């Protein structure tokens, strides 16, 4: 059988995009494959070369699939970044403006834009799009879609190009338990008609229908093996692992704690967009020193609730909300609120696109800016570097942030939330895109940080096993559909 993709001793033409050694890669129709490795292992580099985005030297490639990139039936790549504002940093706060709702397209409009110009869409393609389930939401504007619904919309749009190979980066990121199950079922259904390549950094994210795993480590393709061989090897490696050194001890805290026992008070808070209630008559109090897990399905309003606390949502001025002992809308600036908060979220990752050294991205957390507008002192830079080393990101400090892998960028933004040692730590899915090792390390740092009695935590996660052991309260939201 002629393979769809055949690469022998592949080397990227541009030195910046090369793996450390030439690689071999073969893909046959229906041979659904996972590219697996830790953050920074080289998964994205390999994926770009497989997809033809990075030309190879010589005659390493013997198939013609990459040349079909701009035609029907080639390789298509799907990465689930936020699609609300095209990754524009200015849109980070504008997303929450109710008046902006009119600028968002509907699902039907987004699907129509994805159709090939001047060509009739085949019945087979329409069937595939129908299988995504997104056609049940044609009249919704995309800002009202849950993460799982957005995932289905982006997948459906890609199907109009009738790919032979669909490559998906971190397919389950940001999805709740039910959405993960549902999206896995969708991928399995799609696998009957096209060939899938999934890029993952966690073993738990390898779907049951995947039969082949390609592993990378330190920018080198190390193993190509069956699913069974992969899990057996990983089990054997776990038995011989050398314990990692403990993270650096935490520095003494110097950031002030706002006066008053209650950090946050919501009294009968309701938030609506159009005719839909996002939050409905919510009463909630967070006291100093409490550690909260904020849970609920995609679309339940968790990110909206956090936007009210972080002073990003203008509806906060009209709601009966007290932050750090003061009623919102009584003349305080958003910076007076933000100075007490360390924050990271998927939306921040999507919109923080600054070409700066990673240490400057981390240091921007000292002054709550998206970008670095005040040069940190040498002492501040050294302090930020200590925090990067604490999270295992010290070797990223001088690298251009935009040259890092998605997982490495997310790690730098997590460091950014800690550098000013805030009184209130708000972590919205902080382990998005992090491998198991970095997740465990970060969780232990959170526990150590929250051992201080005057620090408060609110953390969102769709994985209960990710929650740190310090969690002592839980607020569960439900969708108001």
Which stretches of residues belong to each language-model region?
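The feature captures the beta-strand-to-loop junction immediately N-terminal to the Walker
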Residues: 36-38, 295-297
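ABC ATPase nucleotide-binding domain signature region
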Residues: 47-116, 306-370
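Walker B catalytic motif
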Residues: 141, 170-171, 176, 400, ...
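Conserved ABC ATPase signature
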Residues: 141-145, 149, 373-376, 400-404, ...
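Hydrophobic anchor residue at the start of the ABC signature
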Residues: 154-155, 414
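Conserved beta-strand-loop-alpha-helix hinge in the C-terminal portion
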Residues: 208, 216-244, 468-469, 473-481
């Amino acid at each position: 059988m002629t393979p769809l993709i055949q690469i022998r001793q592949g080397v990227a033409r541009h030195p910046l995009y090369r793996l450390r050694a030439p690689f071999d890669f073969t893909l046959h129709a229906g041979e659904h494959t996972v590219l697996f490795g830790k953050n920074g292992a080289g998964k994205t580099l390999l994926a770009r070369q497989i997809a033809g985005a990075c030309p190879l030297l010589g005659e390493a490639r013997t198939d013609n699939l990459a040349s079909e990139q701009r035609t029907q039936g080639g390789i298509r790549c799907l990465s689930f970044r936020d699609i609300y504002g095209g990754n524009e940093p200015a849109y980070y706060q504008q997303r929450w403006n109710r008046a902006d709702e009119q600028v968002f397209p509907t699902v039907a409009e987004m699907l129509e834009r994805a159709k090939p110009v001047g060509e009739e869409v085949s019945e087979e393609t329409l069937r595939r799009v129908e299988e995504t389930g997104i056609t049940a939401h044609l009249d919704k504007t995309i800002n009202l879609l849950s993460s799982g619904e957005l995932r289905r919309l982006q997948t459906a749009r890609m199907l109009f190009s009738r790919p032979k190979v669909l490559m998906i980066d971190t397919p389950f990121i940001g999805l709740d338990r039910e959405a993960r199950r549902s999206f896995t079922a969708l991928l399995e259904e799609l696998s009957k008609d096209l060939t899938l390549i999934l890029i993952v950094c966690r073993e738990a994210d390898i779907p049951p229908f995947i039969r082949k795993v390609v592993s990378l480590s330190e920018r080198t393709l190390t193993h190509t093996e069956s699913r069974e061989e992969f899990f057996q090897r990983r089990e054997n490696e776990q038995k011989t692992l050398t314990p990692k050194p403990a993270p650096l001890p935490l520095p003494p805290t110097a950031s002030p704690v706002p006066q008053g026992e209650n950090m946050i008070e919501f009294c009968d808070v309701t938030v609506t967009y159009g005719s839909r209630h996002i939050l409905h008559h919510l009463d909630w109090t967070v006291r100093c020193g409490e550690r909260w897990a904020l849970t609920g399905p995609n679309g339940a309003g968790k990110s909206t609730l956090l936007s009210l606390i972080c002073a990003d949502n203008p509806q906060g001025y009209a709601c009966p909300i007290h932050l750090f002992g003061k009623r919102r809308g009584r003349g305080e600036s958003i910076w007076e609120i933000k100075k007490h908060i360390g924050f990271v979220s998927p939306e921040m990752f999507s919109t923080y696109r600054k070409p700066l050294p990673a240490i400057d991205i981390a240091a921007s957390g000292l002054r709550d800016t998206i970008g670095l507008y005040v040069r940190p002192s040498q002492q501040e830079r050294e302090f930020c570097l200590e925090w990067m080393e604490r999270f295992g990101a010290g070797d990223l400090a001088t690298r251009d942030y935009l040259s890092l892998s998605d997982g490495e960028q997310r790690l730098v933004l997590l460091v950014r939330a800690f550098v000013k040692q805030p009184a209130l730590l708000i972590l919205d899915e902080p382990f998005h895109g992090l491998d198991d090792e970095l997740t465990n390390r970060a969780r232990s740092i959170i526990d150590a940080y929250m051992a201080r009695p005057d620090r408060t935590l609110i953390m969102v996660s769709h994985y209960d096993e990710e929650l740190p052991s310090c969690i002592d309260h839980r607020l569960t939201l439900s969708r108001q559909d």
